[in-house]
């Protein structure tokens, strides 16, 4: 199937609402600790009061951060990136790269189970939207123009992420390259 240069959405997965899902959990050092079945969060009335206006707009209303504008988009500090809404671990600094776009970009998620994708035809474009698998928060978009080894670029809104640095003692032992 010709995808017009975009990721084939026939493999995109959006979990059904109001069901339990299986996600991969991670230690504070970013190491997988096992799969866990948890309930999806499809509606949480406290999101508007718990999130900043920008994070709410991005995650719940599918807005986009302005490029180069949100603190942390270009951080090189070792750590993990969690969903700002529900805390699900999504990405690692080890897969982060500078795409020059002004948004955090990753070659892959930490665990495929923790994200969902679906076709996005908004604004007259054909894209693949990236969402948190647990709470359906809009994270950003997936493009087929990333570096090796995946060739993918997960272009993610910084306002949708909560960065958690690795513990200082684990950075020296496990994360030096």
Where do the PLM segments sit?
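N-terminal pre-domain segments of enzymes
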Residues: 4-45, 172
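A short Gly-Trp-Pro
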Residues: 26-28, 39-44, 48-82, 88-177
């Amino acid at each position: 199937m010709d995808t017009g240069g975009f990721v084939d959405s026939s493999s995109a997965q959006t979990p059904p609402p109001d069901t339990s899902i299986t996600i991969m959990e991670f230690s504070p050092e970013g190491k997988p600790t096992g799969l866990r079945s948890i309930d999806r969060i499809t509606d949480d009335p406290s999101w508007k009061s718990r999130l900043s206006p920008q994070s709410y707009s991005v995650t719940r209303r599918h807005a986009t951060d302005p490029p180069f504008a949100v603190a942390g988009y270009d951080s090189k500090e070792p750590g993990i990136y969690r969903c700002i809404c529900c805390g699900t671990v999504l990405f690692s600094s080890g897969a982060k790269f500078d795409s020059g776009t002004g948004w955090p970009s990753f070659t892959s998620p930490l665990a495929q189970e923790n994200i969902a994708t679906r076709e996005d035809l908004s604004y007259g474009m054909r894209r693949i939207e990236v969402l948190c698998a647990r709470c359906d928060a809009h994270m950003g978009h997936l493009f087929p123009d990333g570096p090796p080894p995946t060739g993918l670029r997960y272009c993610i809104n910084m306002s949708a992420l909560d960065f958690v640095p690795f513990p200082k003692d684990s950075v020296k032992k496990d994360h030096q390259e």
